[in-house]
């Protein structure tokens, strides 16, 4: 009886010990699971905070770069506007000047029918004559440089006529015939000279001889009135 009682007590004590060990293991497992969950939550929160901080830093950097670019663009745009303004002012001034010139020309053209009217290219022409005829005549006069009242031209032609008169009198000894030849020579040279522009040619030839005459002129010689 005593042996059976001791064996039953030992079995009861062993069962209790096993139950305590199982309970202890379960509690440790629960602790490990709780710690693992806490670590996972901490890691997740830290990763979310780092991502939010990185996004905020990127947004701040982008905003700063955009503000810098806007600050740089503003001074660069300013001078361009200031540069464009003088061009517009110059164009307006040119248009205003052209309008004033046109007004002056209209005022000059508003005279009587027989007045001299200035034109842009053809020089002076008489109002009432055709514009095409005036331009042609002015261009011909400018090209030939003809002056019908040129005293030097008439003097040269008169010299030719006198020379022809003297030669004719030397050969024929008749003053009437000599005067006729001289007058014909003078008239023919006048018409030919006016028509073909001999005035300009004679002037050009004499102007070519003027430098030679100046070279041969004595340095101490002066003209006296």
UniProtKB/Swiss-Prot annotation:
Q: Which InterPro entries match?
A: TMEM40 (IPR026181)
Start-end of Basic and acidic residues biased regions: 15-29
Report the subcellular localization: Membrane
What are the transmembrane regions?
Answer: 152-172, 179-199
What are the Basic residues biased-composition ranges? Answer: 30-39, 78-87
Q: Which UniProt keywords apply?
A: Acetylation, Membrane, Phosphoprotein, Transmembrane, Transmembrane helix
Q: Which residues carry this modification: N-acetylmethionine?
A: 1
Query: What's the domain of life for this entry?
Result: Eukaryota
> Where is the region Disordered?
1-96
Report membrane topology: Multi-pass membrane protein
- Here the segments flagged for biased composition (Low complexity) are 1-14, 46-68
- Indicate where the modification Phosphoserine is found in the sequence: 129
Q: Which GO terms describe its cellular component?
A: membrane
The primary location reported for this protein is membrane
Q: What is this protein called?
A: Transmembrane protein 40
Q: Which organism is it from?
A: Mus musculus
Gene expressing this chain: Tmem40
